[in-house]
């Protein structure tokens, strides 16, 4: 279940799931919880995945992926896995931390591990969405944000796209608001 930390003077934290969902809805961020217990046990917390295992993850959540894709007009999906076993992890994380936006939604469903989306709210204040297995988030188009990992430095996520080509980040700044 996701938690929120607002980058305000009090570092306000929201942990109650109804309040998390309400806050994200007020920011026009889609947040859903999918039944992660459906994931086959041999894929839980596995970060070095074969193409067949990635397809098995997509097949497991096919109904949910089709549902949100129908509602939002998404056309493609894939599975990404990041962990310390990737020799380019630090380089990838540096690139991910560059604040950017897209001309379409950025959608992630966390399968294993953890991730953080840092999103600019409607009032200009940034907030963190700390995601756990079972959490789906859709950052709306043209909203400034970036993604990073939590302390465990590993995540498996389903990415869902509007086009079969995926999305292209548009960078506004080289510095990151943290």
From Swiss-Prot:
Ni(2+) binds at residues 100, 102, 106, 145. Its EC number is 1.13.11.54, 1.13.11.53. Catalyzes 2 different reactions between oxygen and the acireductone 1,2-dihydroxy-3-keto-5-methylthiopentene (DHK-MTPene) depending upon the metal bound in the active site. Fe-containing acireductone dioxygenase (Fe-ARD) produces formate and 2-keto-4-methylthiobutyrate (KMTB), the alpha-ketoacid precursor of methionine in the methionine recycle pathway. Ni-containing acireductone dioxygenase (Ni-ARD) produces methylthiopropionate, carbon monoxide and formate, and does not lie on the methionine recycle pathway. The keyword Iron applies. The record marks 108 as: Important to generate the dianion. Pathway: Amino-acid biosynthesis; L-methionine biosynthesis via salvage pathway; L-methionine from S-methyl-5-thio-alpha-D-ribose 1-phosphate: step 5/6. Fe(2+) binds at residues 100, 102, 106, 145. Keywords: Amino-acid biosynthesis, Dioxygenase, Iron, Metal-binding, Methionine biosynthesis, Nickel, Oxidoreductase. It comes from the Bacteria. This is Acireductone dioxygenase. Its cofactor is Fe(2+); Ni(2+). Pfam families: ARD. GO terms for biological process: L-methionine salvage from methylthioadenosine; L-methionine salvage from S-adenosylmethionine; methionine metabolic process.
């Amino acid at each position: 279940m996701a938690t929120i930390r607002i980058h305000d003077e009090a570092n306000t934290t929201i942990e109650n799931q109804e309040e998390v969902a309400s806050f994200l809805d007020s920011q026009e961020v889609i947040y859903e919880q999918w039944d992660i217990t459906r994931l086959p046990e041999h894929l839980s917390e596995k970060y070095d995945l074969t193409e067949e295992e990635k397809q098995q993850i997509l097949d497991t959540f096919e109904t949910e992926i089709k549902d949100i894709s129908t509602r939002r007009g998404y056309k493609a999906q894939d599975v990404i896995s990041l962990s310390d076993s990737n020799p380019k992890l630090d380089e990838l994380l540096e690139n991910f931390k560059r604040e950017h936006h897209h001309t379409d939604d950025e959608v992630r469903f966390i399968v294993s591990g953890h991730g953080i989306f840092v999103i600019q709210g409607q009032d200009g204040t940034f907030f963190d969405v700390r995601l756990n297995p079972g959490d789906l988030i859709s950052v709306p188009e043209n909203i400034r944000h970036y993604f990073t990992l939590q302390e465990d430095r590993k995540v498996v996520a389903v990415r869902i796209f509007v086009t079969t080509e995926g999305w292209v980040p548009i960078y506004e700044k080289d510095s990151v608001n943290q």
